[in-house]
Amino acid sequence: MNSVAIFDLDGTLADTALDLLNAGNLTFEEIGINYRLKENRDEGISSKGGRSTIRQGLLQDNGFIDEQLVENLYPKFLKIYEKVIDDNSVLYEGTLEMLEYFKNNKIQLGVCTNKPKKQADILLNKLGIHSFFEIIVGPDTYNCAKPNPKPLLNTIDNLGATIKSTVFVGDTNTDYMTSKSAKVPFILLLYGHGVIHQSFDTSCTPYLAKSASEIIDITIKILKKYWNFF
């Protein structure tokens, strides 16, 4: 049975907030929305995805949100985002070394994100870490998004693992709810977008990581309970 570590992407592997905000502002500019997202004020919105970014602009500009307009604008947002996807996005400190450690120790790696798979593939290639992952799953892979547990459970199954031989690493309440529904051990990354910019009860899990090296230590601790591979 394979041992597996699965990661969220935005706010977990990389700080992507500024490029998401910029894509939102460029989208707003094209359609005549005057509101502009700002890093310090709106960074937390970006951690919720492109649609939430659009909703913020519509709400602030019009005072209400037209969900049909959100859906109509989303493809435009994605096209714009692809053009700026790595202008400012960077891996968190220690992420590359963490991935190298896991690969060298025969732990298979996957990504389970709410970013569409095309954009996830582009970003991971731009960041130079795409080749570390055996599988990359977005909301369009199985036609459902986190916190539905299906994307995570299918990722585990495709990697030849079980929930007891898997850890899931994320930074948002959505990630936590996904792992809870799937009954997969969850490592909460304390330096990601979700914890910093959203209200989050960190007592939801005993596994709290303040650095990439702590993710390694906690993963070993969890998986050693079930598998003697170190």
What residue ranges belong to the model's regions?
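A short, structured active-site edge motif that brings together acidic residues
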Residues: 40-42, 71, 130-144
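Non-catalytic pre-domain segments flanking phosphatase-related domains
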Residues: 1-7, 224-230
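Short acidic-hydrophobic, aromatic-tinged amphipathic segments that line or gate anion-handling sites
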Residues: 206-214
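Conserved Lys-Pro-Asp/Glu-containing loop-to-beta segment of HAD-superfamily phosphomonoesterases
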Residues: 146-176
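Acidic, Mg2+-coordinating phosphoryl-transfer loop and its flanking beta/alpha structural elements
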Residues: 168-207
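Substrate-recognition element of Asp-dependent hydrolases with the DxDx(T/V) motif
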Residues: 98-125
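N-terminal helical cap/lid subdomain that shapes the substrate entry/recognition surface
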Residues: 2-96, 101, 105
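Conserved H-loop
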Residues: 34, 129-134, 162, 206
